[in-house]
A protein has these predicted regions:
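Non-catalytic C-terminal accessory modules of carbohydrate-active enzymes
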Residues: 239, 257-266, 278-310, 336-347, ...
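Positively charged n-region of N-terminal signal peptides that target proteins for export
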Residues: 1-4
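Extracellular/oxidizing-compartment recognition motifs
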Residues: 25-110, 114-496, 504-505, 521-522, ...
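C-terminal motif of bacterial Sec signal peptides marking the signal peptidase cleavage site
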Residues: 18-19
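Alpha-helical support elements that line or immediately flank enzyme active sites
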Residues: 183-187, 197, 372-391, 427, ...
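Active-site acid/base region of carbohydrate-active enzymes
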Residues: 191-192, 262, 280-287, 443-477, ...
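Alpha-helix capping and helix-loop boundary segments enriched in small/acidic/polar residues
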Residues: 158-165, 202, 210-214, 224-226, ...
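C-terminal capping/lid segments that line or modulate ligand- or cofactor-binding pockets
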Residues: 236, 302, 497-498, 516, ...
């Protein structure tokens, strides 16, 4: 029986309308953003960029023009008068990153904007009015001083070794005697802060502001507090935790100083007058509050007997407090924070609490998570209750803490009286599944606890499910692991005495993560951390911010600087990172040529193919030379790829004079590399590791005509020597899944994913993992480096999930999914995949089910985009004309259907 693909648009149910012109009401503009933020405060760029999405009830929606208006008040904007910018009618399909081109914007002022669009289906109405607020645009805009308590005032406090310090409480009363038009707080509380106005939290942000290299850059936050002020006396209060400013370990980790506050409250009255409340010596401070210690590695200690009832309200008596000290300035440039702070984003309900014979209780959250434990318990006066955290249990049900190294990860709460209390820490987080609770004299219930999941405030953008439960569980583990390690920087791990922004973990990982989360603002900020950590010679620290200062002059770890910038352009259409960081990237490229280029290859390498599966399961790193890839192979292949990236970046930045030098060096390196490392008789690179061959193949160094032979070596090595299992470390895994699939072995790629024996992701899951381990052998390896919550071994797996299994991929000749390539590989062994990705243009969906040679595939293409849909001819396809279908063509192996926006369904008949 002949099979036919039936293509149905989402509007077929409205077939009677197909001949009618849609009214303008059907064209909707939403998801309006300034610099990828919704109605943001604290924009400090001179030409903010606007973006939006469009939707309509009919398929094939294309924007043909837009008009943007900006004014200093919402009333003026609605009336269309006193406009600061009117773009006029611009004929364009661009709906992302359109720069403001009006009158000069003023520091600290609010602005209002709206947009309307023209489309091929009619013109829309003006959008709802949106707003943004400008930040400080000059250092002279700041009038306050850095203040705090410039002493170790409490017993046991220390600024060396395992540091210990109490939180600082600061307060400032002030008067409001007139009607308030607008009030905005500009604040930087280092290391972390909580802010209050008249007893109420100003925001839900936690661990604010973002961590940075404080001697280079200090971030501040901006909050509109207009509705929180009251006539008469008001009280501004701030609590300061240590964060990364007062470091957890000294020496060993970079430390900057004692916690410090810079704040400026600007109050504008309806009569046009202004007041300022600034941080200075008129503030009061104390460290004699209930948070007697806070250290991100070691935990928080809270003594309820020292609570300062009402300290952040007007009526509190602060006569026992000290006058605030003027603190040493951090030294870094004050910068409006470009990305949101961390926030509580999810809650985990414990699955079990078990009493031990020693009187302690073990709480099982059921999920390795990062954040803090909230409790509602009954305590006894002056009897501390201790909460100790771990990812894993020992066989005897005690906590396994060996992999935490020196981190104590312990919170202590001391009740003020007998009775019930509720509490969670403020300035620490833990990576944990299990909690040991001691100090209770009764059996608690699971309902007495809640796990609060804390990570950078960002939206979840990706959903994925398939017919294979293990494939789904790996995705779930990845989801939990990734958000666990978003801590204002992408960290390596959330639990031990490290928690650093290692560059090597994210070179490719950031691209896969971008399918699950809208991580653009976080990674833009991290690129600034990397630049701030670059030294005068041009070398890049492999940890950024450089809390560990490691200038290894390695290639593979710093490559993340380039790959992440490229990801932001490809995934989100934002080229600003490439333009901003191009000079620093060029400096690093030149530096590496000077220190590491020898006879046409890069000879420096520090980390190798980090964490490839060792031959003995107690090892962290393989000791077998046959498993190790030559460091010069790793460095040269990656540097060659970066030269090609720099050609692209130079063209984008208008630095075309740089291009010939990059191209010349790339050609010379390719020739020298192959002369030194490629065996033409065997088509092997170096000692024939999978990593050596797949990097050479995917990064374009294999001589023409040898590609298939090199790939055959990859397959033989994988199947014959490793039984169809992973044999790569951090570098090889970045290319493994896509490389196997691109050259026709999607079956082997799926086998690697669905393996349940060592080494594999399935092995981790069978051993109880609910996140991704640092090591393939995380259940048996030396605890010195054995995190149970890392993401570096994901490599290109998530990219493969969304692009190859689901078929959601940005076309090579487009950015930001303006043109979508939908070509699932339909591997045998998977009968169903359903996935979606919330792109900057809107949601893309792919939902396919296969039964033998019958296919049912539903796709959704968002407004103002197009898609190329590729269907294997094995399903016996034919397509007739239909609204939204632009073109149908055939190749030898597939039907190619080019469509506009809409919902379509392909079903074998």
């Amino acid at each position: 029986m002949k099979k036919q693909i039936i293509l149905c648009g989402m509007c077929l149910a409205l077939a009677g309308m197909m001949g009618c012109n849609p009214t303008s009401d059907s064209v909707q503009v939403n998801h309006l953003q300034v610099e990828m933020k919704n109605n943001p405060q604290g924009i400090d760029v001179a030409h903010p960029r606007f973006s939006w999405q469009i939707h309509a009830g009919q398929p094939d929606l294309v924007q043909t023009g837009y008009r943007i208006q900006v004014a200093a008040s919402a009333d003026d904007l609605k009336a269309g008068k006193n406009l600061l910018w009117d773009s006029g009618d611009v004929k364009s399909d661009q709906s992302l990153w359109i720069a403001y081109e009006g009158e000069q914007l003023q520091a600290k002022k609010p602005y209002f904007w709206r947009v309307k669009v023209d489309t091929n289906q009619g013109s829309g109405k003006w959008s709802d009015v949106q707003t943004w607020g400008m930040a400080m645009l000059d250092a002279n805009d700041w009038k306050g001083q850095w203040i705090g308590e410039n002493a170790l005032s409490n017993p046991g406090e220390k600024d060396q070794g395992e540091t210990r310090l109490a939180a600082r409480y600061l307060r400032k009363p002030f008067q409001v005697s007139k009607e308030v038009k607008r009030a905005v707080l500009y604040i930087s509380g280092l290391g972390s802060s909580e802010s209050y106005l008249n007893g109420k939290r100003i925001s839900k942000d936690v661990f604010a502001p973002m961590p940075s290299l404080y001697t280079s850059r200090v971030y501040y936050n901006v909050y509109d507090v207009t509705d929180m002020l009251q006539q008469g006396e008001n009280l501004l209060g701030v609590v300061l935790g240590n964060g990364r400013y007062f470091s957890m370990r000294v020496p060993g980790m970079l430390t900057t100083g004692l916690p410090s506050l810079l704040a400026q409250l600007e109050v504008e009255y309806t009569d046009g007058s202004m007041d300022q409340v600034v941080s200075d010596t008129s503030w009061k401070v104390t460290s004699q509050g209930p948070i007697v210690a806070n250290n991100e590695f070691d935990g928080e200690e809270y003594d309820a007997r020292k609570e300062l009832k009402g300290w952040n309200t007007v009526s509190f008596d602060d006569s026992a407090w000290k006058t605030a000290d003027v603190m040493k300035e951090p030294g870094g440039k004050l910068t409006a924070q470009p990305n949101p702070n961390l926030a509580v984003q999810d809650t985990v309900v414990p699955v079990n609490v078990v009493a031990r014979s020693d009187g302690k209780f073990i709480l099982d959250m059921g999920q390795n998570m990062v954040g803090w434990l909230g409790v509602k318990l009954k305590g006894k006066d002056n009897q501390p209750i201790t909460f100790r955290f771990a990812e894993i249990l020992n066989p005897d049900t005690t906590l396994y803490v060996a992999n935490l190294r020196s981190a104590k990860v312990t919170d202590i709460y001391t009740p003020a009286a007998d009775g019930e209390f509720s509490w969670h820490p403020s300035f620490v987080y833990h990576g944990f599944r299990y909690v040991e609770v001691s100090g209770l004299d009764y059996q608690p219930s699971t309902t007495d606890f809640a796990g609060y999941v804390v990570y950078d405030a960002m939206s979840t953008t990706g959903q994925f499910e398939s017919s294979n439960a293990l494939v789904n569980q790996i995705h779930k583990n990845a989801f939990w692991g990734i958000r666990s390690n978003y801590r204002g920087m992408p960290t390596d791990c959330p639990q031990r005495d490290e928690r650093l922004g290692w560059l090597g973990d994210r070179a490719t990982g950031a691209s896969g993560e971008a399918y699950l989360f809208n991580n653009a603002l976080l990674y833009n900020k991290w690129l600034q951390d990397i630049e701030d950590s670059q030294n005068e010679a041009g070398s890049i620290s492999v940890v950024s911010p450089k809390y560990w200062e490691i200038y290894a002059d390695d290639v593979t770890w710093p490559s993340a600087y380039f790959y992440v910038a490229d990801m932001l352009y490809r995934q989100f259409g934002d080229d600003s990172a490439i333009r901003k960081h191009y000079p620093s990237m060029k400096r690093w490229m030149q530096h590496m040529e000077e220190v590491a280029l020898k006879d046409g290859v890069i000879v420096n390498d520090t980390y190798g193919d980090w964490c490839m599966p060792p031959e003995e399961q107690h090892l962290i790193h393989s000791q077998d030379p046959a498993r190790k890839t030559d460091g010069a192979i790793l460095s040269t292949t990656v540097y060659y790829d970066l030269l090609n990236k720099m050609v692209k970046f130079a063209e984008l930045c208008g630095q075309t004079a740089d291009i010939p030098a990059y191209q010349k060096l790339a050609a010379e390196m390719k020739e020298a590399y192959n002369a030194k490392y490629f065996n033409r008789e065997t088509a092997q690179y170096g000692n024939n590791t999978v990593t050596a061959n797949i990097l050479s193949l995917r990064l374009g160094l294999v001589p023409e005509g040898f590609e298939q032979k090199v790939f055959d070596n990859i397959v033989r090595k994988t199947e014959d020597d490793f039984g169809g299992h992973v044999s790569t470390g951090v570098l090889g895994i970045q290319h493994l899944m896509r490389g196997l699939t691109e050259y026709g072995r999607k079956d082997l790629a799926l086998k690697i994913v669905t393996n349940e024996t060592y080494p594999s992701w399935g092995y981790m899951i069978n051993k109880g993992a609910t996140t991704i381990w640092e090591l393939w052998n995380g259940d048996t390896a030396d605890p010195a480096m054995n995190s149970a919550n890392h993401v570096m071994l994901l490599g290109d797996l998530l990219i493969w999930y969304y692009e190859d299994l689901a078929g959601i991929k940005c076309a090579d000749d487009a950015q930001a999914f303006k043109k979508i390539e939908m070509a699932p590989v339909f591997p045998e062994g998977l009968n169903h995949v359903k996935a979606s990705y919330e792109s900057v243009y809107g949601k893309i969906e792919s939902d396919w089910t296969r039964d033998g040679n019958r296919l049912d595939w539903r796709v959704v293409v968002p407004g103002n985009t197009t898609a190329v849909i590729r269907i294997p001819k094995a399903y016996g396809v034919s397509v007739t004309s239909h609204p939204g279908v632009h073109q149908v063509s055939n190749t030898e192996t597939e039907l190619v259907v080019e469509v506009g926006s809409g919902e379509y369904r392909f079903t074998s008949k």
